[in-house]
């Protein structure tokens, strides 16, 4: 899936730009996907690259969408020492978008919680994966 990063960045709304380009954080419980339950794929709002699946989403009660793991190598982790804290930042590899942070207080075997800003994501419903060019990810929902 080809994209023009500069053009896509120009089309972002204020919150999407602040989060993805300026490492911002949207307000908890006041964002699009924190309690979203539909089956599908969460992709990078800038590049369109798949990041997370609804199968790995869980209710962490933190006010942001939370996932136990990314679906492929598109997610990078970097040390973040901003705001007087030591955290692990999560960024998209292709667009270098700030997505959120990963913490070691999650459920499941890996114990991770990927706390992601909704503004960094676009949701593609399972029934539209083929239509939008994500057909190769349909197998993730058959497990």
Curated annotation (Swiss-Prot):
Coiled coil: none annotated. The keyword Oxidoreductase applies. GO terms for cellular component: cytoplasm. Its EC number is 1.8.4.12. It holds the Pfam family SelR. Residues 5-126 form the MsrB domain. It comes from the Bacteria. The keyword Protease does not apply. It catalyses: L-methionyl-[protein] + [thioredoxin]-disulfide + H2O = L-methionyl-(R)-S-oxide-[protein] + [thioredoxin]-dithiol. GO terms for biological process: protein repair; response to oxidative stress. The active site is at residue 115. GO terms for molecular function: peptide-methionine (R)-S-oxide reductase activity. Keywords: Oxidoreductase. NCBIfam families: peptide-methionine (R)-S-oxide reductase MsrB. Belongs to the MsrB Met sulfoxide reductase family. This is Peptide methionine sulfoxide reductase MsrB. It comes from Bacillus subtilis (strain 168). The lineage of its organism: Bacteria, Bacillati, Bacillota, Bacilli, Bacillales. The gene is msrB.
């Amino acid at each position: 899936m080809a994209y023009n990063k500069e053009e896509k960045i120009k089309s972002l709304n204020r919150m999407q730009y602040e989060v993805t380009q300026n490492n911002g954080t949207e307000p908890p419980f006041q964002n699009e996907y924190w309690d979203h339950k539909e089956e599908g794929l969460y992709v990078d709002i800038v590049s369109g690259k798949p990041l997370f699946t609804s199968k790995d989403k869980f209710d962490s009660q933190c006010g942001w969408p939370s996932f136990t793991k990314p679906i492929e190598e598109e997610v990078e982790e970097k040390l973040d020492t901003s705001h007087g804290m030591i955290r692990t930042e999560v960024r998209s590899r292709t667009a270098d978008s700030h997505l959120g942070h990963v913490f070691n207080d999650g459920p499941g075997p890996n114990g991770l919680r990927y706390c992601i800003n909704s503004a960094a994501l676009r949701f593609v419903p399972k029934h539209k994966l083929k239509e939008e060019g994500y057909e190769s990810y349909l197998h993730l929902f058959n497990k």
